[in-house]
Amino acid sequence: GTLRPALDVVDAARAKGMDVWMDSGMYTDWATYAGTATFDEQTIKDNSLRFGDMVAATGKYTGTRLNRELYELLRHKYPDESIICYSGEPYEIYEALQKPYAMMSTDAGAYAPGEGHPQIAGSYPRFLRKMVREKRLLGLEEAVYKCTLLPAQTYHIPGKGVLEPGYDADLVLFDRDAVRDNAKMPD
């Protein structure tokens, strides 16, 4: 995968005193719009991506694996439709999210039922299930910190991240022994 070299760059920058942070979701696949630079031919080539590793995530081709013809059609006629690309390895995500400067992230968007990427709804439950309960790579307190206070501090968002008088009380209650992600890829 390509994440290890990226982590090396961040580590080197932080070692020089640079204020560099990162975030990661919990999925080795990712999604974005067909018309973005992410899916231009040079980027696909530079990252050794294959059309067969991509699936249409929205629109009339939802769930269809791409070939060159469908790729061209989506890029040029349906640039606002999403494509999911399968790349990376789970161990890379686990390594990245153990870094003290790494925050948990998710995607946002309005999608019809059965469309979009499961990261929209499944990221945080998957993070807690995999990183805390199953793999024991993080303690619960550290995991919650990476989802709450760390982003609030990093992005200087006032009134967020802790339970204190005058702060917004954004609470999520969950059973640490039962939390799980139910989100799935489009059919």
Regions found by a protein language model. Name each.
Residues 84-87, 138-144, 152-186:
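Acidic, glycine-enriched loop/beta-strand segments at the rims
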Residues 103-104, 122-126, 130, 142-145, ...:
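Feature representing long, continuous alpha-helical segments
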